[in-house]
A protein has these predicted regions:
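A conserved short coil-to-beta-strand element within the FAD-binding core of flavoproteins
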Residues: 12-27
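Flavin (primarily FAD) binding-site architecture
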Residues: 46-59, 141
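A conserved FAD-binding loop/helix module that cradles the flavin
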Residues: 48-52, 278-309
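An anion/pyrophosphate-binding glycine-rich loop and adjacent beta-alpha core
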Residues: 64-65, 75-220
């Protein structure tokens, strides 16, 4: 309604093939349409997805090839397939090899990487929803870590983020003691995990720790289970389902634009906003906020530019008329 009241002309099914900068100062931009026609404009705001922006922009504008981000992660072990579509409230940690690399990391008999972080450093930790998929992990925690992942990184799934690792063994021993008093008998591993995690998750944890759910909890086994409850490891192999990615990373370099107006420094009157700029953020509405905020900055500046150009044109026209009237 506001656009209609202001006399804004809207075009649909009108594909822009290229944006050509003015050939001289004060001249308009040329917008080449896909059907061969063209339009003129005093200012242009590019507000498209990063993958489309490159073909529109003039040569020489610094640009980083877009890649999907804020999406699920593909992982190496096969056990997430058994938990497909199961959600847990937990935490994901992203670990990266240090200068010593990843050589020497042991695997147990089931092929599960042992819960050690020797030779690695913690890159980031996200607490929130973790959703297992056939290819790996999804959910907000995985989406946010996707922005930071590099080849060779490893995820560690923390199923009990409310308990510190240093307190986990004591937590399990106390739980065993309380269950024994409540049940009136010795406690099995199935008893220990029931109510802590979902049954399919418990099966995976027991396999990872090489424990039998029907066997009684033995002294020393709580240390092993604590390790996997606090960090069941998943080597990252890449991006999961690309269709689930919410934004692209890449686009026009932020160094190429004025941070107050989003105007391209080398091409006055050309503005780049939203996903077309190399700006991305975590989940939580930040990317949408950036799209609206950058659009407002560019819109205000473009409107001022158009008004200034109109004033110059009027002044030039008035001067010309005065000269003609005063001519002999």
């Amino acid at each position: 309604a506001a656009c209609a009241a202001a006399g804004v002309e809207e075009r649909v099914e009108c594909e822009i093939a290229a944006v050509e900068p003015p050939r001289a100062e004060g001249s308009p931009f040329t917008l080449r349409l896909a059907d061969g026609r063209f339009e003129r404009a005093g200012a242009v705001i590019v507000a498209v997805g990063g993958a489309i922006a490159r073909g529109l922009l003039p040569e020489g504008v610094p640009f980083r090839e877009p890649e999907p981000t804020l999406g699920p992660l593909a992982t190496e072990p096969r056990w997430p397939r058994r938990l497909d579509n199961i959600r847990v409230r937990g935490a994901l940690e992203l670990w990266r090899p240090d200068s010593r690399g990843m050589d020497g990391r042991a695997l147990n008999d089931g092929g599960f990487p042992m819960g050690t972080h020797e030779g690695e450093r913690l890159v980031s930790r996200e607490v929130g929803e973790v959703m297992f998929r056939k290819y790996g992990v999804s959910g907000i925690a995985a989406f946010n870590l996707r922005r930071l992942v590099e080849p060779g990184d490893v995820l560690a799934v923390d199923f009990v983020p409310w308990v510190r690792l240093c307190d986990m063994e004591a937590f399990l021993n106390r739980r065993r003691k309380l269950l024994r008093a409540s049940l009136g008998r010795d406690v099995t591993w199935s008893d220990m995990l029931r109510g802590m995690v979902l049954s399919p998750v418990a099966d995976v944890l027991l396999e990872a720790a090489a424990l039998d759910g029907a066997h009684l909890v033995a002294k020393g086994e709580t240390v092993r289970m604590a390790t996997f409850l606090k960090g069941l490891r998943l080597p990252v192999t890449g991006l999961g389902d690309v269709r689930q990615c919410q934004v692209h990373r890449g686009g026009v370099s932020v160094r190429a634009v004025d941070d107050r107006t989003c105007e391209v420094r080398r091409v006055p009157g050309l503005y780049v906003v939203g996903e077309a700029l190399d700006v991305d953020a975590a989940c939580g509405g930040f990317n949408l906020h950036w799209a609206w905020a950058s659009g407002l900055l560019a819109g205000w500046s473009a409107a001022e530019r158009i008004a200034d150009l109109a004033s110059l044109a009027d002044a030039s026209g008035s001067s010309g008329s005065e000269r003609r009237e005063g001519a002999p």
